[in-house]
Structure formats: structure tokens, C-alpha cells
């Protein structure tokens, strides 16, 4: 009897673990059409979340049921002159992959001597996929 209970527990554990595992594919299926959102066009709820998080590097997503907004912030920087490049935005079988790069000010740039909090917000069509930030 005791062996039957132990075997049943092991089988249940294996079954439950297998059901919870979802394979995350990194194979690119298609590029995603997107636009970079100006600050005045960011939904208020999202803008408030950005303001709360901007001191430290952060990543977040926000949906209004029609569009999906992806945000990457690079935290406090000592000067102005930073820009953010979208390296990749594409889908796999079950994920959205979003990769960005922070570029610092150039040697010849006129630099604002004040702390800045660079972030980028992109808007794309809503997809119910997990977002992977790179």
C-alpha cells in the first residue's frame, strides 16, 4: 500500500511539472511593426509607472487591449545626450523579443550637465505573448 502511494505521488509530480512547462522558442518568426511613442502620447497610467521606476533600470509592458506598449529604462545617467536604439523587435512561436541599446553622448556633443533618465516606449499591435527583453 505504501509503495502504491509513493508511486502515485511521483507520477502526479511528474505530470504536474510537465503540464506547467512551456517551451520558449527563440527562433524568429517575423519582425514586428512598431512606432516609438512621444512622451505626450504615452497613456497616463503607463507614464505614472515610468515615473515611479525611472531612477533604476527597468523593463515593463502595458496593454490597453488594442495596443501593447514595451518600455525599457536605463536608470539615472550623469548627463544628457543619451539615445536608445531598438536593435530587434520580433516574434517567435510564443514570445515577443525586444532588444535595445543605450548609446552615450558623443565626444563632440554638447552635453547637458544634469542627471537624466533615458527610456524608450514603443507601441505595437497587441499580442498575448510573453515579452523577452534583451
Predicted regions and their residues:
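Exposed, flexible binding/inhibitory loops of compact, secreted disulfide-stabilized domains
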Residues: 3-8, 18-134
Amino acid at each position: 500500500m505504501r509503495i502504491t502511494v509513493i508511486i502515485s505521488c511521483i507520477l502526479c509530480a511528474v505530470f504536474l511539472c510537465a503540464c506547467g512547462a512551456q517551451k520558449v522558442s527563440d527562433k524568429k518568426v517575423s519582425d514586428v511593426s512598431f512606432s516609438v511613442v512621444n512622451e505626450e502620447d504615452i497613456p497616463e497610467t503607463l507614464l505614472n509607472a515610468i515615473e515611479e521606476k525611472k531612477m533604476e533600470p527597468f523593463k515593463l509592458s502595458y496593454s490597453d487591449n488594442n495596443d501593447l506598449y514595451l518600455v525599457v529604462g536605463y536608470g539615472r545617467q550623469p548627463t544628457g545626450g543619451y539615445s536608445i536604439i531598438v536593435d530587434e523587435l520580433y516574434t517567435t512561436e510564443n514570445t515577443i523579443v525586444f532588444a535595445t541599446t543605450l548609446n552615450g553622448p558623443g565626444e563632440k556633443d554638447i552635453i547637458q550637465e544634469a542627471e537624466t533618465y533615458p527610456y524608450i516606449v514603443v507601441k505595437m499591435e497587441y499580442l498575448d505573448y510573453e515579452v523577452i527583453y534583451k
